[in-house]
Swiss-Prot record:
Single biological process term from Gene Ontology: protein transport to vacuole involved in ubiquitin-dependent protein catabolic process via the multivesicular body sorting pathway
Top-level taxonomy: Eukaryota, Metazoa, Chordata, Craniata, Vertebrata
Protein known as: Vacuolar protein sorting-associated protein 28 homolog
Record-stated family: Belongs to the VPS28 family.
Every VPS28 C-terminal domain range: 131-227
GO cellular component, one term: endosome
Pfam annotation, one family: VPS28
GO molecular function, one term: protein-containing complex binding
Keywords associated with the record: Acetylation, Cell membrane, Cytoplasm, Endosome, Membrane, Protein transport, Transport
Source organism of the structure: Rattus norvegicus
Gene3D superfamilies given in the database record: 1.20.120.1130, 1.20.1440.200
Length: 228
């Protein structure tokens, strides 16, 4: 009597031990990159640096394709360069000594961004300080620098006033800015406040909060002007 051929699993069939993951609850466990808060911060910092470099690469490509205006590009690139410096300081150490090493380690292929980082200026910037794009880059950088200092609780008069004065002088060099530009008025008012303080005097919590709000508003107004 013909008993037939023993049944065999179909093509692509998996053994029971593989096809039934329910038998292995460990497969559903979350895999964490870190074991403690310090390690988590380390990976967060590396992720921030990675994101900044990728964003800068995308911005460079957008500018090459004429998708952003020179003024918009200059402001955005200047902001990213400031953010890059802050992000890299958080990562730099025994494991990562340079941005080149960081890119090799994480296979980050962003040649346009690397060129911007090494030149430390947007491609629109020339060497002369009277150049419009140089002024735009300096204004963006100084706005961010002062706001970062305040967020880091650096609030002494002699630590804030020099950058704020330079910001004011740079805006004055921009003939394109209208005389009644609100950002210029905001910075001027705070310079007057600081001029009435001694070098060691510090802004109180209320003043820091208000100054941050005012500078953020002025910075946003400057960006709106660039897009107009």
């Amino acid at each position: 009597m013909f008993h037939g051929i023993p049944a065999t699993p179909g093509v692509g069939a998996l053994p029971c031990s593989v096809a039934a993951p329910g038998n292995k609850p460990e497969l559903y466990e979350e895999v964490k990159l870190y074991k403690n808060a310090r390690e988590r911060e380390k990976y967060d910092n590396m992720a921030e640096l990675f994101a900044v470099v990728k964003t800068m690469q995308a911005l460079e490509k957008a500018y090459i394709k004429d998708c952003v205006t020179p003024n918009e590009y200059t402001a955005a690139c200047s902001r990213l360069l400031v953010q890059y410096k802050a992000a890299f300081r958080q990562v730099q150490g025994s494991e990562i000594s340079s941005i080149d090493e960081f890119c090799r380690k994480f296979r980050l292929d962003c040649p346009l961004a690397m060129e911007r980082i090494k030149e430390d200026r947007p491609i629109t910037i020339k060497d002369d300080k009277g150049n419009l794009n140089r002024c735009i880059a300096d204004v963006v950088s100084l706005f961010i620098t002062v706001m970062d200092k305040l967020r880091l609780e650096i609030r002494a008069m002699d630590e804030i006033q020099p950058d704020l004065r330079e910001l004011m002088e740079t805006m004055h060099r921009m003939s394109h800015l209208p005389p009644d530009f609100e950002g210029r008025q905001t910075v001027s008012q705070w310079l007057q406040t600081l001029s009435g303080m001694s070098a060691s005097d510090e802004l109180d919590d209320s003043q820091v909060r208000q100054m941050l709000f005012d500078l953020e508003s002025a910075y946003n107004a400057f960006n709106r002007f660039l897009h107009s």
